[in-house]
A protein has these predicted regions:
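Conserved beta-strand elements of beta-rich interaction domains across eukaryotes
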Residues: 106-109, 114-118, 224-227, 233-236, ...
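Catalytic activation segment of kinase domains across protein kinase-like and atypical kinase folds
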Residues: 240, 284-358
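Protein kinase catalytic-loop region centered on the HRD/HxD motif
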Residues: 274-287
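Protein kinase-like catalytic domain
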Residues: 211, 280-283, 371, 391
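Helical subdomain adjoining the active site within ATP-dependent kinase catalytic cores
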Residues: 2-59, 308, 318, 332-425
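Generic preference for well-ordered alpha-helical elements
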Residues: 197-204, 213, 262-273, 357-360, ...
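ATP-binding glycine-rich phosphate-binding loop
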Residues: 32-182, 197-201, 210-214
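Conserved structural core of kinase catalytic domains
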Residues: 143-197, 202, 215-272
């Protein structure tokens, strides 16, 4: 009996030890898996950061051009000599378009710098990119008069905008005023070359065209085709700026948790509708919004709508010229940016120039999720009706101009009636 008891005790102890061993192995496996996943996340984030965030290289290249006398501007001295314009957090989403938050003295701003896409290991591409970069700052040529430069700008804007009713004379005057960076009443060759390079950028052109409307951040200064704008205090439009690897359901939940109160969202929504109105046959031509992702928009502390990133808002004429050259086999081949779609002409195998959806339709699709949720019960039904009528619009805005304007005004009136009594509206 004692032997049986001893055997039972030994067996029990062995089983306990085996259970403890299995638990230890399981714990070690979980820890190893956590380290592996954590390392993968760190690697992905670092790889993404090192590829996307090359602001130091971009500013160093611009300062080299400044010291050679190729470029000039109100930000050059602060960036290259005094070190009072500093880059902070990387906001880039594309390697060729460096975007950083930064400080310029006491001012918070956003620094944008264009960079060649050629990989560092591709020597041939680097040489070609170098030639293109040098050529970019060769215009206008030495000896160009201010009057000739004015004509060059006007011709460039005509090609970009291509609308008879656009006030291109006023836009040309604004471009010349911006070129005189030190406000001495003269435009140096380096200043002219810098402003010419900036005018090739759609986002800079839009900021110049809408500088009095308040929808785009104010331009604070430039150096070559690097330029600084005011920082939009709250961006993205809703939610938080989550890493790309965050699950979609987490991002969507955050979008709803971190949105402002409804009457503030209504005011922001009115700002978006006013921007759509300004971009449709505005004083300086028509522009198309080719990516209405929430990350590209934001708002101020007073809940005034702002465009945080205008790189995907393009002049309609520029869009039409680019899309006409695009070969296609089906309609899905005819996409510019993210959501500027046209149809495919199968007889020519070319994309047609007319967009399938006007800006207003895409804006209403954003507002359906943004302003309809939590809307007061007394206007929710009518608001939903107007938003659905808006999203049902088809064809370009020119083809249904009256209906386009009617839907836009109905939405603005409905929102304004509800929020006009609020002191911060």
């Amino acid at each position: 009996q004692d032997n049986v008891t001893c055997a039972g005790v030994w067996l029990t102890q062995s089983l306990n030890q085996w259970s403890e061993f299995r638990a230890s192995v399981r714990c070690l496996f979980v820890c190893w898996l956590a380290v592996l996943v954590g390392s993968w996340v760190v690697y992905v984030e670092y790889s993404s950061y090192s590829e996307l965030c090359r602001g130091r290289q971009c500013t160093a290249a611009m300062c080299a051009k400044y010291r050679k006398g190729l470029v000039d501007g109100s930000a050059c001295s602060s960036l290259c000599d005094k070190d009072t314009l500093e880059l902070d957090k990387c906001l880039s989403t594309h390697a060729a378009k460096q975007v950083y938050s930064g400080m310029w003295g006491d001012l918070e701003g956003v620094v944008r710098c264009r960079m060649d896409e050629a990989p560092a290991y591709d020597v041939g591409s680097q040489m070609e990119a170098g030639k293109e970069a040098a050529a970019l700052f060769d215009t206008p040529p030495t000896g160009t008069s201010v009057e000739k430069f004015r004509e060059m700008i006007l011709d460039h804007l005509k090609a970009k905008v291509d609308e008879e009713q656009a006030n291109l004379g006023e836009l040309t005057a604004r471009a010349l005023a911006a070129a005189d960076a030190n406000k001495d009443g003269r435009i140096s060759l380096a200043e002219a070359r810098s402003s010419w390079a900036l005018l090739q950028l759609n986002d800079f052109l839009l900021a110049l065209a809408l500088q009095e409307r308040g929808h785009t951040p104010k331009i604070l200064g430039f150096c070559g085709d690097l330029y600084v704008t005011e920082k939009v205090p709250n961006a993205p439009l809703y939610g938080v700026r989550a890493p790309a690897w965050t699950p979609a359901w987490v991002r969507r939940a955050a979008d709803h948790w971190f949105t402002p109160a409804w009457h503030h969202r209504a005011k922001i929504s009115m700002g978006l509708l006013e921007l759509v109105e300004d971009l449709f046959h505005g004083a300086f031509g028509s522009f198309l919004m080719c990516d209405l992702s929430a990350a590209h928009f934001g708002y101020t502390g007073r809940y005034d709508f702002r465009v945080a990133d205008a790189q995907n808002i393009v002049p309609q004429a520029t869009f039409q010229e680019a899309i006409r050259q695009q070969r296609c086999d089906r309609d899905t081949d005819c996409v510019y940016g993210v959501d500027c779609l046209t149809s495919c002409d199968l007889t020519k195998r070319r994309c047609t120039p007319e967009v399938a959806e006007p800006n207003l339709v895409k804006a209403c699709r954003v507002l359906e999720d943004y302003v309809l949720q939590g809307a007061p019960s007394d206007i929710r039904e009518e608001l939903e009706k107007q938003l659905y009528a808006c999203m049902a619009l088809r064809g370009s805005a020119e083809q249904a101009e009256i209906q386009h304007s009617l839907v836009l005004n109905n939405l603005k009136t409905l929102l304004w009636k509800k929020i006009s009594h609020n002191k911060d509206s």
